Structures are given as structure tokens and as C-alpha cells.
Amino acid sequence: MLVVNVWGSWCAPCRVEAAALEQAATDLTDEGVQFVGIVIRDSLTSAQQFQEEQGVTYPSIFDPDSSTLLQVPSSLYPVATPTTYVVDHEGRVAVRILDKTTAPTLTGLVEDVLAEREAA
């Protein structure tokens, strides 16, 4: 399972949610959940500084011109920053959050998706 967060260092809600995402990533490690960020409309220096200051340890893809995001189907294209996706084991987007999130909310949603897989 994969959690993808679209963010930018210039984004105030991204700054608010950074610690929550890091906490969720830590809490879900034993479940085999991977986290990755996609940095948009940002400089590499600002993005790296943001990750260091916010204590973000999961990797991020540097996408200043949004070319990576252009690969996302238009129905799922992020219309807000931050946007967080939970991608299930079959590669389907199971959850899309169009605002900042909290660790309990994100962890709960991921656990729900994991439970659906186990029930199947």
C-alpha cells in the first residue's frame, strides 16, 4: 500500500500537516505502508529545507513543473495543495484527501483500506 502526499514548501497547510504525515508513516511502518511525497511548484533547495525543518524522513519526488502529476488521470488530479492519496495493493486510489489531514485520520483511513483487503 502507498500513501502519496502532494505538497510544496510555500503551502501553509502542508507545514501544518507535515508532522502528522511523518507520525502516520512511522505508525504504519509495520503494516508495510510506504509513504512518498510529490513536491510541486517549488525549488529543490526550498523543498529540501522544508523536509529537514519538518523532520520528514520519507522520500519525495521533485516535480517543479508538475510533469509527474500530469501522469495522474484527470479525474484524480489534485485540485488543492496538499492532496493525499491512499493507493491500495491493487494500484487503485482508495482515498483522496483534498486538504491537510491529521495522523489519526490518515492512519484510520489506511487501516480501513487494509481491513478491506484482509476481508476479501
Question: Where in this protein do the model-derived segments appear?
Answer:
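Short active-site neighborhood of thiol/selenol oxidoreductases, capturing the structured segment around
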Residues: 1-15, 21
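Structural microenvironment flanking redox-active thiols in thiol-disulfide oxidoreductases
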Residues: 15-54, 65-71
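Thiol/disulfide oxidoreductase modules built on the thioredoxin-like
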Residues: 52-56, 64-115
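Non-globular targeting/processing and membrane-anchoring segments
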Residues: 117-120
